[in-house]
Amino acid sequence: MKQYLDLLKHITETGVAKGDRTGTGTRSVFGYQMRFNLEEGFPLVTTKKLHLKSIVYELLWFLNGDTNNQYLKEHGVRIWDEWATETGDLGPIYGRQWVAWEKPNGDTINQIEEVIQTLKKNPNSRRMLVSAWNPADLPDESMSPQENVKQGRMALATCHAFFQFYVANGKLSCQLYQRSADTFLGVPFNIASYALLTHMIAQQTDLEVGEFVWTGGDVHLYNNTLEQAELQMSRTPYALPKLKIKRKPPSIFDYEFDDFEIEGYESHPHIKAVVSV
């Protein structure tokens, strides 16, 4: 994926040194956009091998409204382990905000369902957004993730904050705004996850896929991933794979892991890096 390699190059060549919450330090740029035509292939990075199982199971977990790490661990996915409490709780993170955003009266809003219904009834609407950024639930940066959860807050502040859908010529496009972007470890997962979600919602609303647009705010490489980024930039991308969805479930909330197949995924070897907590 040339777009992603161009981003790595942009950060390494123009990024500024900044401190951060984790204490690791970053090289950072502010504001960047990548566009992916989903008709041309599924945007899964090929210059290092990605753990596709983690991407799919995490998305299904979000859609289930689940905020406990146990489901992921049962399926061999460990990407949230560092932030969870001893019982697996992560507080009101993405899944809660997506499908059970709490109103002042205690009722909840299923933002995903509302978007799908709007796509079916009024696809020209400019209000087809989902927000996971809820200031009332953000963690206190002076506390550990686990301490925040025990006080009813998110373990980790929302990074991929909100996304919007757009329909033109019978094609569904999605734009994500990611306020904080760990470009080496996180962004490849986020691109694939939201591209997958766009395919799923397109299927549910009888639309074709259009573009996935990724927009980043503080877009950075942690200092402990700079060498890995250089290695990745030295590799030549392979052709993008294709996504096959084997069946159309009754609703967006009924997909299962085995419903998805990635055809023709060829990649360079995995590049190991340590996540900054």
Curated annotation (Swiss-Prot):
Keywords, sorted A to Z: Cytoplasm, Methyltransferase, Nucleotide biosynthesis, Transferase
GO cellular component: cytosol
Reactions mediated catalytically: dUMP + (6R)-5,10-methylene-5,6,7,8-tetrahydrofolate = 7,8-dihydrofolate + dTMP
Record-annotated active site: 159 (nucleophile)
Entry binding sites for (6R)-5,10-methylene-5,6,7,8-tetrahydrofolate: 51, 182, 276
Binding site for dUMP: 21, 126-127, 179-182, 190, 220-222
Documented EC number(s): 2.1.1.45
A Pfam match: Thymidylat_synt
Enzyme class name: transferase
Quaternary structure note: Homodimer.
Family of the protein in this entry: Belongs to the thymidylate synthase family. Bacterial-type ThyA subfamily.
Primary role: Catalyzes the reductive methylation of 2'-deoxyuridine-5'-monophosphate (dUMP) to 2'-deoxythymidine-5'-monophosphate (dTMP) while utilizing 5,10-methylenetetrahydrofolate (mTHF) as the methyl donor and reductant in the reaction, yielding dihydrofolate (DHF) as a by-product. This enzymatic reaction provides an intracellular de novo source of dTMP, an essential precursor for DNA biosynthesis.
Protein's UniProt name: Thymidylate synthase
Organism per entry: Hydrogenovibrio crunogenus (strain DSM 25203 / XCL-2)
Highest classification ranks of the organism: Bacteria, Pseudomonadati, Pseudomonadota, Gammaproteobacteria, Thiotrichales
